[in-house]
Amino acid sequence: MNIESQSSVSEKFSPFLTFTRKQWAELRKSVPLKLTEQDLKPLLGFNEELSLEEVSTIYLPLARLINYYIEENLRRQTVMNRFLGNTNANVPYIISIAGSVSVGKSTSARILQSLLSNWPENRKVDLITTDGFLYPLEKLKKENLLHKKGFPVSYDTPKLIKFLADVKSGKPNVSAPIYSHLTYDIIPDKFNKVDRPDILILEGLNVLQTGSRKAEQTFVSDFVDFSVYVDADEALLKEWYIRRFLKFRESAFTDPNSYFKDYAKLSKEEAVETAANIWNTINGLNLRQNILPTRERANLILRKGADHAVQEVKLRK
């Protein structure tokens, strides 16, 4: 069997359909882009560049696909309500966005929120990050888990699952804790309210995890209707993390209230060494042990290249 034949056989038995950037862009069809450069700027992450061309090429087709899934989901809910004789409101559609530190999950989530909010159906779209469900800094220190921050063990998973269950059940004004990247901690007594949205986007490192399922055990992924994994080679992720760390050293870290204010005093060489060490001992380790193994569970994978642009899209069949 030649290489070309092996490739076609591999694709045939893959659970994913693979699209080049050009092929995926064609699936936008005639959907108009209402987002402007001015609208895009506040959606971007720190030290991240993303063009309107990227939005129209990658995210518009994705928003179009998700809307088809939502419409089908609504039809199923109508059938279920008719069967049960219910007049309940529609159940919120939950989208999860997973991936490594520094891959650009937050930007992807905000862009998707903006596009879906402006779709003709005028749906209400809320966005919550799982950072708010990290254990407080004091607890992590007390239990010697600070070096595991971002790992599954550092999250109050039962609290996150209760939040998702309440949202799915249609409860009004469900509270989600707020995390501060400045203080590196949960903000006491401050919450985001999620009030029966049509769509909830949940963004975080480990939202696709299932672990070793025990009887009647519930996972975050059990509440998710459509999952996206933002992917890139680890070498790129590490490079982007170090670059972002250097930018923070000149900006956020200089704030006297910053948990990392001491890093602002580092020379560039010391900062690079520190960031690389953090990656090697924490973020990279978490990626390999906990995040990357969940990639194949996603409904859709966005694979980025060196310029942060998505080069390949994989859609579960």
Curated annotation (Swiss-Prot):
Q: What organism does the UniProt record list as the source?
A: Mannheimia succiniciproducens (strain KCTC 0769BP / MBEL55E)
Q: Which domain of life is it from?
A: Bacteria
Q: Identify its protein family.
A: Belongs to the prokaryotic pantothenate kinase family.
* Pathway the protein contributes to: Cofactor biosynthesis; coenzyme A biosynthesis; CoA from (R)-pantothenate: step 1/5
Stated EC number for the protein is 2.7.1.33
Keywords noted in UniProt: ATP-binding, Coenzyme A biosynthesis, Cytoplasm, Kinase, Nucleotide-binding, Transferase
InterPro entries linked to this entry: P-loop_NTPase (IPR027417), PanK (IPR004566), PRK/URK (IPR006083)
The residues listed in the UniProt record as binding ATP, with positions renumbered to this chain, are G99, S100, V101, S102, V103, G104, K105, S106
- Gene Ontology annotations of biological process type: coenzyme A biosynthetic process
Nucleus among keywords = no
Q: What is its main location?
A: cytoplasm
- GO molecular function (one): ATP binding
Which catalysed reactions does the entry list for this protein? (R)-pantothenate + ATP = (R)-4'-phosphopantothenate + ADP + H(+)
Which HAMAP family does this one have? Pantothen_kinase_1
Where does the record say this protein resides? Answer: Cytoplasm
Question: Any idea what this protein is called?
Answer: Pantothenate kinase
Q: PANTHER family given for it?
A: URIDINE KINASE (PTHR10285)
Q: Which GO terms describe its cellular component?
A: cytoplasm
